[in-house]
């Protein structure tokens, strides 16, 4: 994994905050399988997210 990919792996894909050490969910994109991370606040508020690889959007 590149340094850029590692940075993105520890950021909420919805709001961009650093999620290291926080309650967060990490899951695979339903379309392409890319790992996506979201903070608990964005999950609770059902904020939209977009997969950085394929553009899939979900709640």
From Swiss-Prot:
Record annotation: effect of changing residue 29 to A: Not able to complement the deletion mutant of this gene. Loss of swarming. Severe loss of structure and stability
Alphabetical keyword list: Metal-binding, Zinc, Zinc-finger
Knockout-associated phenotype: Cells lacking this gene grow as the wild-type in complex medium and in synthetic medium with glucose as sole carbon and energy source, but the mutant cells are not capable of swarming and have severe defects in forming biofilms. In this mutant many motility and chemotaxis genes are down-regulated, and several genes likely involved in sugar import, sugar metabolism and glycoprotein production are up-regulated.
Effect on the protein upon substituting residue 51 to A: Not able to complement the deletion mutant of this gene. Loss of swarming. Severe loss of structure and stability
Domain of life from the UniProt record: Archaea
Effect of residue 34 to A: Not able to complement the deletion mutant of this gene. Loss of swarming. Severe loss of structure and stability
GO annotation terms (biological process): archaeal-type flagellum-dependent cell motility; single-species surface biofilm formation
Residues spanned by motif C(P)XCG motif 4: 51-55
Residues bound to Zn(2+): 29, 32, 51, 54
InterPro entries in UniProt: HVO_2753-like (IPR044720), HVO_2753-like_euryarch (IPR049683), HVO_2753-like_ZBP (IPR011668)
Residues spanned by motif C(P)XCG motif 3: 39-43
Motif mapping: C(P)XCG motif 1: 12-16
Chain positions of motif C(P)XCG motif 2: 29-33
GO molecular function, one term: zinc ion binding
PANTHER family, sorted: SMALL ZINC FINGER PROTEIN HVO-2753-LIKE ZINC-BINDING POCKET DOMAIN-CONTAINING PROTEIN, ZINC-RIBBON RNA-BINDING PROTEIN INVOLVED IN TRANSLATION-RELATED
Subunit structure: Monomer in solution.
Record comment regarding domains: Contains four C(P)XCG motifs, suggesting the presence of two zinc binding pockets (ZBPs), but only ZBP2 (comprised of C(P)XCG motifs 2 and 4) is occupied by zinc. All four C(P)XCG motifs are essential for protein stability, folding, and functionality.
Function: Zinc-binding protein that binds only one zinc ion. Is required for swarming and biofilm formation.
Record protein name field: Zinc finger protein HVO_2753
Native source species: Haloferax volcanii (strain ATCC 29605 / DSM 3757 / JCM 8879 / NBRC 14742 / NCIMB 2012 / VKM B-1768 / DS2) (Halobacterium volcanii)
């Amino acid at each position: 994994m590149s340094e850029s990919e590692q940075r993105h792996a520890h950021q909420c894909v919805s709001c961009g905050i650093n999620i290291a050490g926080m309650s967060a969910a990490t899951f695979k994109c339903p379309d392409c399988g890319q790992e996506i991370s979201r903070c608990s606040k964005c999950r609770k508020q059902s904020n939209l997210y977009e997969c950085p690889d394929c553009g899939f959007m979900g709640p």
